[in-house]
Amino acid sequence: MQVRHQSIKSRFRFLTALALVPCLTGCFASPGGESSSGGGPSGPRLRVALAFPPAENFSPYGADATLLSRLGVTEGLTALDANGAAAPALARSWRREDDRTWRFTLREATFQDGTDVTPAAVAAALTHATKARPAPTALAGVTLSAEPDGDSGVRVTTAAPDPVLPMRLAGPSLAILSPKAYGKKGERPGAPTPVGTATGPFEITKVNGGGSATLDRHDDYWGGLAHATGIDARFVKDGTARANAVRTGDVDIAEAIPAAQATTLDKPTLKEAGTTRTTSLQLNTRTGPFKDPALRAAARTAIDSSALVKGVFEGYADPGAGIFGPAVTWAESKRVKPAGRAKAARPGGASITLATYDNRPELPEVAQVVQQQLQKAGFTVKLEVREYSRLESDALAGKFDAFIGARNSLLDTGDPVGVLGSDYTCDGGYNLARLCDKKVDRTVAEAVRTDGTGERQDAAMAAEAAILGTDAVVPLVHQQIIAGVSTKVRGVVLDPYERALVGIGTRR
């Protein structure tokens, strides 16, 4: 680990932080414990197998943002608690000054490069995020500015009222990094490096391409010393290999165990929990056969999701009910029936390319079943399967007619409106369906403006109905988390939002 300056001030932070809220973020590790110069808990390194390698050089502005948060590398001003509400993180408190302005009070904390977390550094980090292109998904449809306010405050102003801004700032893509992350004079505004520049309990010290990463404990972390002295992360896209690694003791924790492999693990090592992740069929509405709403309707009516639940997920999933599934506990009672759907046309042998990725091993199986169902309905279907990092850019560019992916609907902001804006509006940064519909944009914009928890939920469900009414997306199943965990390991975080995996209390 790199040697860093540790001031009396930062030592004081460590001593006082031991009683503070534990971090719920994740990380990677390898064998062999060591003592910490700072004292406190100290245990062996953790060995963790993750399904997805970094696709964008660990940029916090894209898909790699959740890798960083799950590894315990990055944090935002806020976090989400178990109920999905905003909770303190780098900001210990906040208040709303008017409809468009919030003031966040920072706690004393230190970046992994040894510099202090200051209002100026935080404001600069948020400003860099607003300039990233494409925009981070947490900022879909939102314009904001940030400026330091005194010795411990940051004032954030939005162009339009944003009642869920504290939840939005919990998004992994809005992680706070030190000025060093952006290069001299901010020369890397769109591609900051989180290596040694974040604030979490674990610091990336070595990246071995897309194969593995080494993390060491951040001994000056504001929340106290993590039990594990580090993490050795392996990126293992093959789900069977991840399950075998748990079974043989080669890793301590393996995420995304395939349903087909769950029965092969000893029951004490199998951990499962509900998640807000939905697997969906996204149809390209801008080019190709699915530009025709009638053919999109034909695809929707061809799908039998119960066959996927039983045949592919072996009961570890629920049939697709909408963009929001049963883990979003309030959604079902507020769901609105889609209206104005096109009448299904006969496909007549229309030729389509269906793409998916194999980092989640169930997805190719899902794609094969969907391929068969679409072919039975009269489509000619070519299936293309790649590793996610080799697929994402083509999918976003609309090079496929249909795409099957798994998306956590509350991952980016914890706000149900957030995913609707990023995934289904004209300016959305993760719009795989390439949908641009005036009615959808209008209903999502109305939801964005809506204040009050219940009222905002109602508005989100109205927007969901408008989106489903276009048949741009066909919800297939709502997934469960299945993880393999050694019986020697304690404190693994099974987070329904999938932002966290390893916390400061995770140990063996």
Regions found by a protein language model. Give the residues of each.
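N-terminal lobe/hinge region of extracytoplasmic solute-binding protein
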Residues: 49-98, 127, 197
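Surface-exposed binding/hinge segments that line
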Residues: 137-182, 206
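Gly/Pro-rich hinge or "lid" segments in bacterial periplasmic/extracellular proteins
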Residues: 170-224
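Ligand-site clamp/hinge motif
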Residues: 218-263
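Periplasmic-binding protein-like
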Residues: 286-327, 365, 467-472
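Structural transition elements
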Residues: 314-348, 360-362
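Extracytoplasmic/peripheral linker and loop segments enriched in polar/acidic and small residues
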Residues: 389-390, 421-486
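Long beta-strand-rich cores associated with HINT superfamily self-processing modules
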Residues: 483-508
